[in-house]
């Protein structure tokens, strides 16, 4: 798997109630995500606005309101699997697109993607680029805020200060 720096724009649909914390990975830490165990903060972004919407809606036509935000990302150590599994990698990575929610929440089985996340942590990377399972051709980026280097940059683009500053905006 390639590990390289990224300098790109990324997108995320924010739940309005929590849009005052656009850089928080706490939501994913609460129950876990495809590439993070419960308790591990992770920020899931997409490289295309359409992919961000598809991921937020889980590809369903009827979904809750969201706020689309753009992020500027400069991270030195990101693993890349934009094209999916490559046979030269550890065979564990074949399961990157497993139905992790079904495995964990319904069957009570730890998804193999959490072991992959452990490998990423041991490799010292700050994130992973991977194909979207909700939008063919789309690419996602998971970042681990606790693992970003001091020189890494992650900023939400909000030049006019339109995102709320506290949850009080939604009461």
Model-based region annotation:
Residues 1-30, 34-37, 62-171:
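Active-site and NAD+-binding cores of ADP-ribose-processing enzymes
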Residues 33-63:
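Extended catalytic/binding region for NAD+/ADP-ribose chemistry, centered on the ART fold
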């Amino acid at each position: 798997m390639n590990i390289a720096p990224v300098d790109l724009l990324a997108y995320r649909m924010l739940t309005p109630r929590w849009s005052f914390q656009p850089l928080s990975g706490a939501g994913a830490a609460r129950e876990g995500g495809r590439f993070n165990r419960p308790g591990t903060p992770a920020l899931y972004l997409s490289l295309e606005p359409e992919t961000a919407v598809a991921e937020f809606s889980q590809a369903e036509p009827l979904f809750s309101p969201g706020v689309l935000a753009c992020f500027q990302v400069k991270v030195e150590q990101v693993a890349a699997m934009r094209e999916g599994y490559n046979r030269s990698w550890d065979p564990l990575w074949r399961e990157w697109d497993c139905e992790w929610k079904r495995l964990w929440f319904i069957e009570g089985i730890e998804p193999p993607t959490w072991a992959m996340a452990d490998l990423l942590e041991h490799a010292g990377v700050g994130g992973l680029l991977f194909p979207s399972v909700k939008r063919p051709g789309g690419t996602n980026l998971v970042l681990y805020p606790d693992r970003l280097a001091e020189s890494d940059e992650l900023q939400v683009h909000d030049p006019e200060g339109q995102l709320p500053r506290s949850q009080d905006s939604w009461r």
